[in-house]
């Protein structure tokens, strides 16, 4: 019997199965909170920059609803995982090829890239403060945190997103936590049980 703890499976991104596929099929479409937060409504499908691409799930969902999505990821390892996942989804063909055809992946720091992109809508989902009961945090998110760190520049990123967006910036954050000090007050919020979207309007759409 080995004295070593079991190895955690390597981080893997897959847009064609599991939770991502379930959310695409049964998540509620444009009625769900994320879609409403970015401004989707009948006849309106904004172009979106996901400034913190991470595992790409929000980007994939938004693209599945018809949006053109530009993902920005600065971490080398996560960027490589995303590129691989996009390629595999494209190779899967059918609806997956159509969806990832609306997704573009950029490698770089969103704070510097956002002013060059002139985005209508910017989505920001920075690494959140660790929860008090860390054992309850999904192993996958612990892996992501171990790779990307804590996003110590999150206030600068949110500020840059608000400044760059021509219509709205959206910050995804735990429902019961206040935004970091230094972030302005949102125009409005869309809150669920565990997640809140703080919306900063730049232009009434």
Where are these regions (language model features)?
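A short, acidic, amphipathic alpha-helical segment used as a generic capping/interface helix at domain edges
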Residues: 109-113, 149-162
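Residues at the starts of beta-strands that form the adenosine-phosphate
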Residues: 47, 68, 102, 167-168
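Basic (Lys/Arg-enriched) interaction patch that binds polyanionic ligands
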Residues: 46-81
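Conserved proline-anchored active-site loop of SAM-dependent methyltransferases
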Residues: 48-61, 119-138
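S-adenosyl-L-methionine
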Residues: 1-48, 56, 64, 68-123, 190-194, ...
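Mobile active-site "lid"/loop adjacent to the S-adenosyl-L-methionine
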Residues: 126-157
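Conserved Class I SAM-dependent methyltransferase catalytic core
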Residues: 154-201
């Amino acid at each position: 019997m080995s004295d070593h703890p079991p190895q955690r499976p390597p981080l893997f991104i897959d847009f064609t199965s599991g939770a991502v596929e379930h959310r695409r099929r049964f998540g509620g479409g444009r009625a769900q909170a994320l879609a409403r937060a970015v401004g989707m409504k009948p006849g309106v499908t904004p172009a979106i920059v996901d400034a913190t691409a991470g595992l790409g799930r929000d980007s994939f969902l938004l693209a599945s609803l018809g949006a053109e999505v530009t993902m920005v990821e600065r971490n080398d390892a996560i960027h490589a995982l995303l590129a691989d996942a996009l390629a595999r989804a494209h190779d899967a063909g059918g609806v997956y090829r159509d969806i990832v055809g609306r997704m573009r992946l950029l490698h770089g720091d969103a704070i510097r890239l956002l002013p060059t992109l002139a985005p209508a809508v910017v989505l920001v989902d920075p690494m959140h403060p660790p929860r008090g009961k860390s054992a309850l945090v999904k192993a996958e998110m612990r892996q992501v945190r171990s790779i990307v760190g804590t996003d110590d520049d999150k206030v600068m990123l949110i500020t840059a997103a608000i400044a760059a967006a021509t219509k709205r910036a959206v910050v995804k954050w735990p429902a019961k936590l206040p935004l970091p000090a230094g972030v302005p007050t949102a125009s409005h919020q869309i809150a669920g049980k565990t997640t809140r979207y703080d919306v900063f309007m730049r232009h009434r759409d």
